Curated annotation (Swiss-Prot):
Keywords: Cytoplasm, Lipid A biosynthesis, Lipid biosynthesis, Lipid metabolism, Lyase. This is 3-hydroxyacyl-[acyl-carrier-protein] dehydratase FabZ. The keyword Lipid metabolism applies. One of its GO terms (cellular component) is cytoplasm. It comes from Hydrogenovibrio crunogenus (strain DSM 25203 / XCL-2). Belongs to the thioester dehydratase family. FabZ subfamily. The lineage of its organism: Bacteria, Pseudomonadati, Pseudomonadota, Gammaproteobacteria, Thiotrichales. It catalyses: a (3R)-hydroxyacyl-[ACP] = a (2E)-enoyl-[ACP] + H2O.
């Protein structure tokens, strides 16, 4: 549905911090599905951990947050023009059930819980091979840049 070049239109993130490879499904105001292919060539694996590479949990959270930004902007049918962006405001009930490693395809699903005055609440999950590896509730706030 959205390839990486199209994702650039909704997120300010670029290498090495763009953590969404493709959006596969979008339901306006409701949900978004996307994925990221984890590869050993990514810079975080030089230190986390060279002999046992594991995707840092905070990067999985960030990837889910990037998905929420795409969902919010697309729901409003707005492409950011540099005057506002969505900031991660809170993460609650975060759980990591299994580590993500190089070779995994992280499958994200973010669902809108509510939106009031530019503050969005989402339920977020990450799965690998259909098995849940991470979940959280997230608040994102639209702010002027």
């Amino acid at each position: 549905m959205l390839n990486v070049k199209e994702i650039f239109e909704y997120l300010p993130h670029r290498y090495p911090f763009l953590l969404v490879d493709r959006v596969t499904e979008f339901k306006s105001g409701e949900s978004l599905k996307a994925y990221k292919n984890v590869t050993y060539n990514e810079p975080q694996f030089t230190g986390h951990f060279p002999d046992n590479p594991i995707m840092p949990g905070v990067m999985i959270i960030e990837a889910m947050a990037q998905c929420t930004g795409i969902l919010a902007f697309k729901t409003q049918d707005v492409k950011p023009d540099g005057t506002s962006m969505y900031y991660l405001a809170a993460v609650d009930n975060c759980r990591f059930r299994k580590p993500a490693i190089p070779g995994d395809k992280l499958e994200f699903e973010v669902k809108t819980v509510n939106n009031k005055k530019g503050i969005w609440k989402f339920e977020c999950t990450t799965s690998v091979d259909g098995k849940l590896i991470a979940s959280c509730d997230m608040l994102c706030a639209e702010r002027k840049v």
